[in-house]
């Protein structure tokens, strides 16, 4: 029988591929989006031949490959949001698709993670899934020691060196001195997340999108992370004429610059979307760090995704608060997962690792839950909130997005659509509202949320939504209007 092994991140396939290749050799096929079309067609045709691969290792798109006799589906790091395809359509979740695929073939499904998603853990608690808990780490290595550092207090006492606390610098210095490695985690790429006039507070924004621009020092340009448009860095403020234009905040590029000044002897690598655009760049970064050619890795959430490096003894989480301050009901859950996963990179083999967690709010419950690895506490606390406010795992969410070039048309159409939806779904419909980023690539956006209790007739819901979309399409005022749905959004 065949096995499908799904991973959330292409970077992970490199590490696991080497391990599986040692066992399965030519029986192993790899499939992900960094491969060329020709390479992917080749794998597809091999799957249709009389001698398909026995094991397919891949990112989310591998779930659509043809199989002859599928016996097992493994979804590693099942909590990862990367399994959800956002744009463009189809907006599917590879975990859900894989579970359906396994059902079609009568195959077994295995979900693996140290920090389960609320939905999966709830299903396990309800007896819908089986639950197996591994109480000890591989080879009995202890979980890392997590040291919480109050950066607000240190800033007040003028003891911070940029974004680095003295505790973090001391730990990194010690690790490098002993021939160990360190990882610094900052979930913002670029040099400075924002540029601002020091005199009047003017902030340059993208002309196509409703977002401020990020400074990328390596190319000396301001970049929009939504449409990719670049702008020259202004030398003077168009608002007040001041030449004091400053970068605000810390992106991975700036962290890299500053840490290189503090540790000039360190061999530093940076892992984010900008440094891993090609397949080779990914593989080279991981190989260099695995083999010790680099000893200090700075990265965004990519570094949290199940990578396994023997010599990492210190992990620094530079700004825990940035993960919590999102207008999203899953912010706490995601922050816990991200911090727990990043922490798990420390002390993989042999001795116990150390994690320095920098925050302005050390008393937040989620910080304590990360320190004590208390997933159960987090789960129970969040579950009650979700039940009260009608969120997953008790309700399904559908986000309805309305887009148009003109804001007025977008506003009007979204209100009309909302009225139609309310006639069917009543108080389950919320909105329309402007999302956090209300304009992307010159298109204005409105968002409507539908909350549906579990067990509702999905076929009927689908028919209603299709009908609503067709009705709007018939209206001559809304010829260029775009409407699309995101079911179970993340």
Question: How should each PLM-predicted stretch be described?
Answer:
Residues 1-54, 58-411, 419, 423, ...:
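Inter-lobe coupling/hinge segments of SF2-like helicase ATPases
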Residues 85, 470-473, 489-490:
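Short, Lys/Arg-enriched, disordered terminal segments
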Residues 419, 427, 490:
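Conserved beta/loop motifs at nucleotide-recognition and modification sites
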Residues 436-439, 473-474:
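Short proline/glycine-enriched turn/loop segments at secondary-structure junctions
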Residues 438-440, 458-459:
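Short active-site-adjacent structural elements
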